[in-house]
A protein has these predicted regions:
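Core beta-strand elements of the Rossmann-like FAD/NAD(P) dinucleotide-binding domain
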Residues: 20-22, 285-295, 299
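N-terminal glycine-rich phosphate/pyrophosphate-binding loop and immediately adjacent elements
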Residues: 20-154
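Helical element adjacent to the flavin cofactor pocket in flavoenzyme catalytic cores
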Residues: 228-283, 287
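Residues forming anionic-ligand binding surfaces in small-molecule and nucleic-acid pockets
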Residues: 218-230
Length: 301
């Protein structure tokens, strides 16, 4: 929804009186760049150019092969890809429905510690029961925890919806967003320490902290809740490896007259009358290129 709002804003920018090679140029072909290119192509009818410095598109969806086996560099599993979910619907739009998602087995994760192991089930109720049976003295805190992460997840969705509304309408929606406002400002560690006594249980609940990149002492509980709820219906993997994601999007861009160029490193964004209007850089051979567009979007990472 936020992305759709940004796409709408693109059409409201002041127009520069000059001819352009493309409607939009996107720097970087990671999933953010490719998703934006796909949506601009499909929803706005844009002719889009994607420029990638690397020799492959796709960002962390890259794969490589060794001795006949294929390995992913970034994608381990993805949550909320069950048919009918919001994430699946959005992804099907971005990919043209060309990516199939295979559910991982019932036990999709095992959290192995020196003296105990906990299995994460793709069935929410089964997972909660596993935690309660293993840590019965924390029963009430466990149930409260799941209510809290649900509340935060709902609040984030509400906050996203509010961002699409005019200010007068958004204000009361944000005012009632109490769960997000309260829990987003505390760390994951602070929440756990305030609600749980068992250190082993605390460790289990944050076993997936690597997915959001910060340890519990530094991460917002709201972000933790977003990731935790993301996997409550299990995990999925793209059939045929993660590279099928980029492979599904590139034809959408090219089919509308756009281009996706690898080995093209952007060195400068051109600006005219205070507005970005093009890019220059060099390709693999060292040849300088120059492209212009009404909209310049950078996903360089």
């Amino acid at each position: 929804n936020n992305l759709h709002f940004e796409l709408r804003k693109l059409t409201k920018r002041s127009k520069i009186k000059m001819s352009f090679d493309y409607d939009a140029i996107i720097i970087g072909s990671g999933m953010g760049g490719l998703a934006t290119a796909s949506l601009l192509t499909q929803l706005k009818g844009f002719k889009v150019l994607v420029l990638e410095k690397h020799f492959k598109v796709g960002g962390f969806t890259h794969t490589f092969s060794r001795h006949g086996y294929k390995f992913d560099v970034g994608v381990h599993y993805v949550g909320e890809m069950q048919p009918g979910s919001r994430s699946r619907q959005l992804f099907d739009l971005v990919s043209g429905g060309a990516v199939d998602w295979a559910p991982l087995p019932d036990i999709y994760d095992k959290f192995v510690y020196p003296d105990f192991t906990v299995c994460a089930s793709n069935n929410r109720a089964v997972y909660i029961n596993e935690l309660v049976n293993r840590f019965p003295h924390e029963r009430s805190a466990i149930h409260k925890y799941f209510k809290d992460i649900d509340a935060v997840n709902l609040s984030i969705q509400t906050k996203t919806t509010a961002s699409l509304l005019p200010g007068v309408l958004a204000a009361p929606v944000n005012a009632f967003n109490s769960a997000f406002n309260k829990l987003a400002i505390i760390s994951t560690a602070d929440y756990l320490n305030a609600n749980f006594k068992d250190n082993k249980l605390k460790a289990v609940l944050v076993s997936q902290w690597g997915d959001y990149g910060l340890p519990p002492s530094l991460s917002s509980f709201a972000i933790h809740a977003l990731i935790a709820t993301h996997f409550l219906n299990g995990a999925f993997y793209p059939t045929g490896s993660a590279e099928t994601i980029a492979q599904s999007i590139v034809p959408i861009i090219k089919g509308a007259g756009g281009d996706v160029l690898v080995n093209h490193g952007v060195e400068e964004i051109l600006v005219k009358n205070g507005t970005a209007c093009g890019v220059t850089g060099k390709d693999q051979s060292g040849t300088t290129f120059r492209f212009t567009a009404r909209h310049i979007i950078s996903y360089a990472g």
